[in-house]
Amino acid sequence: MKQLLDFLPLVVFFVCYKLYDIYVASGALVAATAVALVLTWLKYRRVEKMTLITFIMVAIFGTLTLVFHNDLFIKWKVTVIYTLFALALLISQVVLKKPLIQRMLGKELQLPDSVWSRLNAAWALFFLGCGLANIYVAFWLPQSVWVDFKVFGLTALTLVFTLLSGIYIYRNMSEEQKHS
């Protein structure tokens, strides 16, 4: 259910873009993200920090897109969010000395510190790479290509990277954890 609520605004954005334009889609994205946030709160009585940060960025950049009638803002949103996620991961590892990935998953999984560090760094690089890819697609290719890339390309990349991370985690789990 949680994944559906997270994915719903993206579907709304895509459908509204295909039926109308980038401005209707941006407004619908802001509204759908707000609805998803409220529904998440009502169902789980908590909202993850990543979800809240995403909502704030969607609200800011979506509103700026509508107020200034300029799609550059909604295009930059993707890169800004990915950069913030990458920075959070890197700061947690370098400054706070405990990878954010470990803080998020460490209660369920026991892995060597080196594995947590590599996984954390890999996700930081992944987010930076996605942010850079977004810049290229958003500003050098047609808007319709960017929308497809944002909805399908980045979603597929994230799913593949999540799967690869799962394989990496599994290979580094103890035999006891693998069988429990």
UniProtKB/Swiss-Prot annotation:
Q: Which residues form the signal peptide?
A: none
Q: Where's it found, cell-wise?
A: Cell inner membrane
Q: What is its main location?
A: membrane
- The regions listed as transmembrane in this protein's record are 22-42, 50-70, 76-96, 121-141, 149-169
- Indicate whether Transit peptide appears among the record's keywords: no
Keyword check for Ribonucleoprotein: no
InterPro entries to which the protein is assigned, alphabetical:
YciB
Q: Name one Pfam family in it.
A: IspA
Stated family: Belongs to the YciB family.
Q: Indicate what this protein is called per its UniProt record.
A: Inner membrane-spanning protein YciB
What organism does the record attribute this protein to?
Edwardsiella ictaluri (strain 93-146)
